[in-house]
Amino acid sequence: LLHLRWQKVIVGALLLGQAILFSANAQTSSYYRKHLEHYDDKPVHYGFLFALPVTRFGIVHSNTFLTQDTLNRITAPATAGFRMGFVVNGYLNDSWDIRTTPSVSLYDRRVQYEYAKGSTRNELREATWIEIPVLFKYKSQRRMNTRMYMLGGMTFGFETNVRKRLRQGSDFLNTRGSDLTVDYGFGLEQFLAYTKFSPEIRFSHGILNLFRSNDLNTASNGIRRLTSHTVTIYLMFE
């Protein structure tokens, strides 16, 4: 699982590095036009985004799991989702911006139970979430048409299909319908002729316990705490 998660992160880092190399090579030419030269004079900018989140549950086992002898492992493999939304960026000063990226995310989080007799059971949590982050962005100095940045903040999210999930059956894995995460990441701003393109990698770690006990689901009795962990590759246009 750890190998799979880091493989996704490495792929994203390589894509971002490739964009940086492309920008650096372009600036070595003898003539280079500075696009959107007065971009920072406008206090607020709007845009849209597409993103690929790779997400999983972080599991803390309960005392029941430690004392029983029928269940060997409970794991949460990383799975890919999809996200799209809007960008609202407010200028604070030459170094700092405040940003929000309200978005709709489609997640397929999975919990896998491995039993002592060799059998396995998978529970898939398909969910649609609306997520609203508040982020502070620290910007480097602009070098012609390129600028690096780091950002951090928090995101509040809530699930929109809770009733549908509850109708699926009372013996399913039960989780909370809201979450709060700590977010941080880095990205590259590339100023083009008519827009600004920003690839970004962002890490999110949930601080709320999403698990709700369910006596009808005996396998989940081995879980005490579930938290969300997500690595997301963003493509933003402003």
Task: State where each predicted segment sits.
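Predominantly the C-terminal beta-signal and adjacent terminal strand-loop region
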Residues: 177-179, 184-238
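Short glycine/proline- and aromatic-enriched beta-strand/turn motifs that initiate or cap beta-hairpins
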Residues: 25-78, 238
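Transmembrane beta-strands of outer-membrane beta-barrel proteins
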Residues: 44-50, 98-102, 130-132, 148-154, ...
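Transmembrane beta-strands of outer-membrane beta-barrel pores
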Residues: 52-56, 104-108, 140, 154-160, ...
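Outer-membrane beta-barrel channels and translocator barrels
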Residues: 41, 93, 141-145, 191-193, ...
